Amino acid sequence: MKPSWLQCRKVTGAGGLGGSLPASSPARGAGPARRAYVAPGPRGALGGRGCRALSSGGGEYKTHFAASVTDPERFWGKAAEQISWYKPWTKTLENRHSPSTSWFVEGMLNICYNAIDRHIENGKGDKIAIIYDSPVTNTKATITYKEVLEQVSKLAGVLVKHGVKKGDTVVIYMPMIPQAMYAMLACARIGAIHSLIFGGFASKELSTRIDHAKPKLVITASFGIEPGRKVEYVPLVEEALRIGQHKPDKVLIYNRPHTDMVPLAPGYYLDWDEELSKAQSHDCVPVLSEHPLYILYTSGTTGLPKGVVRPTGGYAVMLNWSMSSIYGLKPGEVWWAASDLGWVVGHSYICYGPLLHGNTTVLYEGKPVGTPDAGAYFRVLAEHGVAALFTAPTAIRAIRQQDPGAALGKQYSLTRFKTLFVAGERCDVETLEWSKKVFRVPVLDHWWQTETGSPITASCIGLGNSKTPPPGQAGKSVPGYNVMILDDNMQKLKARCLGNIVVKLPLPPGAFSGLWKNQEAFKHLYFEKFPGYYDTMDAGYMDEEGYVYVMSRVDDVINVAGHRISAGALEESILSLGIVADCAVVGKEDSLKGHIPLALCVLKKDINTTEEHVLEEIVKHVRQTIGPVAAFRKAVFVKQLPKTRSGKIPRSTLSALVNGKPYKVSPTIEDPGIFEHIEAMLKQAS
């Protein structure tokens, strides 16, 4: 049904700082489309006062989840009232291009306006938007919403001056600096589609993505900093353009302060500071709800690059809703997602989510250890009054490995710290319990994917979910994500039976709308195996209470003599023994059983016994916790495991290595040399 509309009504729910769009502006840009429209919602719906409850919680998780499944149009229509729109949508949900779902059809908005301008118009311009903390350069800065707008609107003007228009693509190749966020927001401001590529990717990988995205312009910086080394970005960009097919019109370079200027060839290469000094501010350009905000390339693909496309309107609605409903934050509180802008967590929860919701976001250019030590996280939490932290379990393990008693953290008072969220990989129980003990706050695991852009399962503490869920789970289905566990024949499995984790369609707002220039792969990869469902390609189970336990990728399930054993369950069993700091389990080919599990283990520093004795203890413990069916009896001890920069273990690469097959090292691996060490240890053990 077509909703009735109220023109320019301010909404005061958990979007908090939200309101109408500007009536006029001296800047260039949006032209006559200046007015905001928001839906009042029918009497008695979850909108208005009820919408506030929807965003602020009150133990209503079950009600909200049921409403999101039975009447998604009504549920998300009310959540969308927290966002300011130039033009109302005519239909909340449409499945015209199945399996992709269109949300807020024909509605027009601008996500940069919602993230920055509207807060300033509501008197919050002097509030801190970004805290930049860079131990690698010994730099700290606080940046207000007003200051962000000044930089972003001028940068938008620079882009337009050099021919970038709505619908054009822009590649951003930058380190963890505020200018990377300004670039994202400036693209969004004018309706350009950004593709932010992890700073430090090799030229070949960068070239592949540039050729696929075909950007009008590339934005980069003079250099980035990785552990122990400075990475010069401009030569990497130059080489990528030399070996690639596509040539962008211009390359805009930000020269980082206190360093030598990068010499620029006049005409083609543009200097950031010089361009901004003469730039005119540019206003927000309205875009349709389905307009792509960004392309984010994911790893692990062959053939055409897998570029996840994120539609603007649904993403804005979901992120704003999630900051309060999932993460339990109030506008104005300090939030820190300890990730990289190049990953989906960085897009959603360093940049867009916290700013949409009116929070202060911490942008951290450092590591959990080594910048300068394992007390770094505690310092940032204390110094900036962080209310909630989002990090990967691998970061916690790194801290624990270097400082088992968290002695370096004891000097800091974490008075404002309320909740620690972990995601990115399965969090073993021992890491979870250690985190609770040293941070003294609830530690909540949750699960999501690049494709979804926000959590699929979580403890929605803003909706009254428990802050002490059972260990090992990754939360319950987030409203909008109707999660089910199916076998390969599409039969629903009983509680605690390992199977395929799928989501019944439609996917909620914020999920991807396709793969850039590859819709055939979009349909084939995610929707063909289980028609009517989104295939997460993860394996796990659900308990009787509805908690979801994500065990591993489907292809990480090891088939031992016909028994399906989760690599994640074996890893958790090994880690729970307390003598192994980190481990990865892969299937080793076996002539009798098909596959047998092999564990690559990193011992804790303080273990004073032989590897033979440790292996005996591990084998005994796995038999007790998993059972003899796992046929576990082999481990190889290594000094460290390879990890991607987002903290994931490249299991498929390790599996190939263990089985003596050719393998390719992903450009996202932190220390590629570790594979040679593991290869040597495997030869020594065989």
Curated annotation (Swiss-Prot):
SUPFAM superfamilies: Acetyl-CoA synthetase-like (SSF56801). Its EC number is 6.2.1.1, 6.2.1.17. CoA binds at E226, P227, G228, R229, R623. It is an enzyme of class 6 (ligase). InterPro entries: ACAS_N, AMP-bd_C, AMP-bd_C_sf, AMP-binding_CS, AMP-dep_synth/lig_dom, ANL_N_sf. GO terms for molecular function: acetate-CoA ligase activity; ATP binding; medium-chain fatty acid-CoA ligase activity; propionate-CoA ligase activity. GO terms for cellular component: mitochondrial matrix. Keywords: Acetylation, ATP-binding, Ligase, Lipid metabolism, Mitochondrion, Nucleotide-binding, Transit peptide. Gene3D superfamilies: 3.30.300.30, N-terminal domain of ligase-like. ATP binds at G424, E425, R426, D445, H446, W447, W448, Q449, T450, D538, R553, R564. The keyword ATP-binding applies. Belongs to the ATP-dependent AMP-binding enzyme family. The modification N6-succinyllysine is found at K517. This is Acyl-CoA synthetase short-chain family member 3, mitochondrial. One of its GO terms (biological process) is lipid metabolic process. Pfam families: ACAS_N, AMP-binding, AMP-binding_C. It is found in: Mitochondrion matrix. Residues 1-29 form a transit peptide. It catalyses: acetate + ATP + CoA = acetyl-CoA + AMP + diphosphate; propanoate + ATP + CoA = propanoyl-CoA + AMP + diphosphate; butanoate + ATP + CoA = butanoyl-CoA + AMP + diphosphate. Catalyzes the synthesis of acetyl-CoA from short-chain fatty acids. Propionate is the preferred substrate but can also utilize acetate and butyrate with a much lower affinity. Transmembrane segments: none annotated. The modification N6-acetyllysine is found at K523.
